[in-house]
Amino acid sequence: MSDHPSPERGAVLSADDIARLLPHRHPFFLLDRVTALEPGTSAEAIKNITSSDDVLAGHFPGRMIYPGVLLVECVAQLAAVVYGTAGALRATGEIVGDVADRVGYLAEIRQAKFLKPVVPGDQVVFRLQSGPRVGGLISVTGQASVGRDPVLTVRLAVTERDA
């Protein structure tokens, strides 16, 4: 991460910043921008869906729908940003230390409800809120919406990486 806040409009973390935090790469690097971040607690991010997204090539012929499981993965990647930056994000926006070593894993999809299809041209807004920690698992709740319409609610369990 640079020593200066991202120049992108509305970005707390740009796509380049997120790429420095997460081990994911194309085609599974999914978040475009983090627009709000409270390390260790909550965040908001966006993903723009385009007809050129690789996953839409065959999902579904004649009616492109973004796969629901990848919406869940977006929430899991946002959880990795939230917990990876805990204790490492300075007020200047600078990340200190090697955050990638702290990014954990998706352990469980406890509940997922897909409320509306997501299609090319949609901008999906993801919101994540931290929940209780039980042993090595952290509960999180996430929502996704397109405009004012909710498209996903999900409850996950994530882990921190073993030191």
What are the language-model segments listed below?
Residues 32-35, 110, 115, 129-131:
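Conserved positions in beta-strands of structured domains
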Residues 19, 62, 113-116:
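Beta-strand-rich interaction surfaces with strong enrichment in secreted/lumenal proteins
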Residues 24-66, 70-71:
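Catalytic strand-loop segment that frames the active site of acyl-thioester-processing enzymes
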Residues 2-11, 23, 39, 117-163:
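HotDog/MaoC-like acyl-thioester-processing domains
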